[in-house]
């Protein structure tokens, strides 16, 4: 009956007919749009179109894998790295990339630049020792992450979280602001939490001078920057590279992308390639466990 209705248009009001027609229209509309994007938008850059098409279908594969699993725990991504390496643009790009497919994506802003931190947290910490600031802040960052996980989005993208705090604590330790024992205890507490709660860490990197040049070229002011100077950037980068080494020792899923001689588009492709590979493997591991594959 539904088949005849579909073929001969005998019952346009049949709910199943309406739904089937919607699905067919969607298929043809998507095809038309695909041809338009390929032949009009990317007419002069088919190579770019083909690269985008590949990651598009890899994203679809990940989406389908996600939907067949009963495990609905979020995939957690932390972004960290040298200032002025395109981190914020990457986060926004990835949010758009995944949301357009239908993933529920939650973005957690950098805690220490948030209004909550400035108005509620910082006033209670500003007169305390630096090591207290660097050990108290992670507690709030952890709470922020745990609250997001409870809301069960598909993907959580965090702008500087527990791993980034580890970088700052390493910097503090190197500047003699923390004892060796305090530093050791901090790592003992937070490294397991990082491994347990964050699926992947994406770090963007460049040298201090390139970072400064980018800042001056992106803004109109010539005044001296409050934090962004070569000394502070070199100290941050030293600790960032220390944590890269620590990640290798502790088996933390840390991925560094050097942006010095690459544009934003190149880094975007590299990062999304890394994420899709890791997400796919993450979901396959869950599938093997759930369906008891041998």
Regions found by a protein language model. Name each.
Residues 2-60, 65-67, 216-294:
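NTP-dependent small-molecule kinase module
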Residues 79:
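Hydrophobic anchor at the beta1->P-loop junction of P-loop NTPases
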Residues 84:
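Walker A (P-loop) phosphate-binding loop of P-loop NTPases
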Residues 87:
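Conserved lysine of the Walker
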Residues 90:
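Hydrophobic positions on the alpha1 helix immediately C-terminal to the Walker A/P-loop
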Residues 96-140:
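Conserved substrate/cofactor phosphate-moiety recognition/catalytic segment
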Residues 133-192:
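Glycine-rich phosphate-binding loop used to anchor ATP phosphates in small-molecule kinases
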Residues 168-241:
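A glycine- and Lys/Arg-enriched "phosphate-lid" helix/loop adjacent to the NTP-binding pocket
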């Amino acid at each position: 009956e539904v088949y005849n209705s579909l073929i001969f248009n005998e019952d346009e009001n049949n709910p199943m007919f309406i739904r089937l027609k919607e699905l067919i229209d969607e298929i043809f509309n998507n095809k038309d749009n695909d041809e338009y994007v390929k032949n009009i938008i990317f007419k002069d850059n088919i190579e770019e179109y083909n690269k985008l098409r590949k990651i598009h279908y890899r994203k679809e594969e990940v989406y389908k894998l996600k939907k067949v699993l009963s495990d609905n725990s979020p995939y957690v991504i932390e972004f960290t790295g040298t200032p002025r390496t395109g981190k914020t643009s990457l986060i926004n790009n990835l949010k758009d990339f995944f949301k357009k497919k239908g993933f529920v994506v939650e973005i957690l802003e950098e805690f220490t630049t948030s209004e909550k931190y400035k108005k509620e947290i910082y006033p209670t910490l500003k007169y305390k020792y630096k090591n207290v600031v660097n050990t108290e802040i992670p507690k709030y960052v952890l709470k922020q992450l745990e609250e997001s996980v409870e809301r069960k989005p598909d993907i959580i993208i965090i702008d500087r979280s527990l791993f980034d705090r580890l970088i700052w604590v390493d910097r503090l330790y190197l500047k003699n602001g923390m004892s060796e024992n305090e530093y050791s205890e901090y790592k003992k507490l937070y490294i397991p939490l990082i491994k347990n709660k964050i699926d992947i860490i994406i770090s963007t990197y460049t040298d201090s001078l390139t970072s400064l040049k980018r800042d001056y070229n992106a803004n109109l002011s010539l005044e001296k920057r409050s934090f962004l100077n070569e000394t502070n950037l070199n100290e941050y980068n030293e600790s960032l590279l220390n944590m890269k080494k620590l990640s290798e020792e502790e088996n933390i899923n840390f991925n560094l992308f050097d942006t010095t001689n690459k544009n934003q588009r190149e880094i975007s492709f590299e990062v999304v390639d890394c994420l899709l590979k890791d997400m796919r493997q993450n979901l396959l591991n869950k599938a093997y466990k759930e369906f008891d594959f041998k």
